[in-house]
A protein has these predicted regions:
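Short, acidic/glycine-rich phosphate-metal binding loop used to engage nucleotide
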Residues: 70-76
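Active-site beta-to-alpha loop of glycosyltransferases that engages the nucleotide-sugar donor
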Residues: 5-21, 36-37
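Catalytic-site signature of metal-activated, phosphate-bearing donor transferases
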Residues: 76-81, 102-294
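Acidic donor-binding segment of Leloir-type glycosyltransferases
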Residues: 20-69
Length: 294
């Protein structure tokens, strides 16, 4: 089975190297669209200013699997369409990956076998979304949401939309056998390790974007980064509990829009790549945290 991975990224160097490494061996190709969308263009940001490009260009791509395009786009759908245009025609499935998602070889093999058995149109994941470090994940609606990541590839198909990822063929969305993350978890035990709320810098920039994005504009907690994320990260257990009780969790969306999202202790095992680099990642985390002292 030939799986092509697709990544969109801007200033995502915190876990990008580990993310690429975790999927490289299983990849038919890794297609990356690096650059900015309209919001960042309006702020004068047109490309990554951290080590994102360095990580991609210096990754030991011995099998020439990595295909990179840099540019600016209207929105994330257009950015995804850019990497999708690089997908080889003999691909069986495309797997959308965030720059802070890590997949283990064992889980990838389970997923590949599952794809062979079920032949789904799309496949979602239940997410272990880490918050403010490596010990706790976001529960509630975040935990129950199905993050659609894998899409069946048909020759001649095009990328329709980013939210949630959907392909189309002959002007019609490719739909049918769509399997959710909860079903995948029930059948295989597979979840998605997602470092989406670890890096202070990336959380700060994510919230700046989300506060203007169509999907979340007007629905975010005011001063979320300072009053929720930073206060939680720097707080004691009592302080953290008070913050979560006030906002019914820690997700940036106002609780009335999506429901509760209290944190939970992570009970799983970190991927070997994360354990190997944990000391380095904690040092990066602490260094970034010092940049946001109010």
């Amino acid at each position: 089975m030939k799986i092509t991975y697709g990544i969109i990224v801007l200033n995502g160097d915190f876990l990008l190297r580990q993310a690429i490494e975790s999927i490289y061996d299983s990849a038919h190709a890794i297609c990356i669209a690096e650059g900015s969308v309209s919001y960042w263009n309006s702020q004068g940001v047109t490309k990554s200013t951290d080590d994102t490009l360095k990580i991609i260009k210096e990754f030991p791509d011995k099998e020439n699997k990595i295909k990179l395009i840099s540019g600016t786009w209207k929105e994330k759908t257009e950015q995804c369409q850019a990497w999708f245009n690089l997908v080889p025609n003999d691909t069986d499935y495309v797997w959308c990956v965030d720059s802070d998602e890590i997949h283990t070889p064992e889980n990838i093999e389970k997923v590949k076998q599952y794809l062979k058995e079920k032949n789904p149109t799309s496949l979602g994941f239940k997410s272990d979304s880490f918050y403010g470090g490596f010990d706790r994940i976001i529960g509630g609606f975040e935990r129950e949401h199905s993050f659609k990541r894998i899409l069946k590839y048909e020759k001649g198909c095009t990328y329709l939309t980013h939210r949630q990822p959907t392909l189309e063929l002959n002007g019609k969305p490719i739909q049918g056998n769509d399997i959710t993350g909860n079903q995948l978890f029930k059948d295989t035990g597979v979840t998605m390790w997602h470092g989406s709320y670890i890096s202070p810098k990336q959380v700060y920039e994510k919230i700046q974007y989300y506060e203007t994005a169509v999907i979340s504009k007007g629905n975010c907690i005011p001063n979320y980064f300072k009053d929720v994320y930073l206060e939680w990260v720097n707080g004691c257990d009592t302080k953290r509990m008070a913050i979560e009780n006030k906002w019914k969790g820690v997700q940036e969306f106002m609780p009335h829009t999506r429901g509760a999202s209290f944190t939970e202790k992570y009970k799983g095992k970190h991927p070997e790549i994360i354990m190997r680099d944990m000391s380095e990642l904690i040092t990066k985390f602490d260094s970034q945290l010092q940049e946001y002292v109010y």
